[in-house]
């Protein structure tokens, strides 16, 4: 049973990011935002570590770790010195957009909670924006007002027909 489950998972359909209707340019925008967020986290994290305040140092180390994780997930070719970089990137690609959004936004909020400074806010802004972009893709494309009104009209007609049938059945 475990062998068939592993074979089914390996031969499964395309990653959920494609199933959710992300266009190629939006996917690249999310990846670019992730790489830029990693660079901003790394630079701000280094500046944050140049202090004597322990919470600033902890936030700076967390930001550098965020930068590494963002690069590992969004641009594994930048981390080829890590043997498992491609494996991690493939697993992250299989995550749904809302899961990536929660993960990236959560990673970006932790250093801000540790040390609320301008450096941590600016350094984590792009990383947080990456999570927001993935969250927006999880919401998906919404229909226009005309098609929504048409669907509502069809539902209303179906409800009226059901109501008429129940009245006819009682008489």
Swiss-Prot record:
Phenotype caused by lack of the gene: Viable and fertile. Results in lowered susceptibility to skin papillomas induced by 7,12-dimethylbenzanthracene (DMBA) and 12-O-tetradecanoylphorbol-13-acetate (TPA). In cytotoxic T-lymphoocytes, leads to a complete block of early cytotoxic granules (CG) endocytosis at the immuno synapse thereby impairing serial killing of target cells. Does not affect cytotoxic granules exocytosis and global calcium signaling, however increases latency of CG fusion and endosome recycling.
Tissues and organs where the protein is expressed, per its UniProt entry: Expressed in neurons in the brain (at protein level). Expressed in neuroblastoma cell lines (at protein level). Expressed in cytotoxic T-lymphoocytes (at protein level).
Claim: ATP-binding is one of the keywords in the record: no
Topology versus the membrane: Multi-pass membrane protein
Transmembrane stretches, start-end: 32-52, 57-77, 102-122, 125-141
Pfam families per the UniProt record, alphabetical: Cg6151-P
Stated family: Belongs to the calcium channel flower family.
Protein name: Calcium channel flower homolog
Native species: Mus musculus (Mouse)
Gene that encodes it: Cacfd1
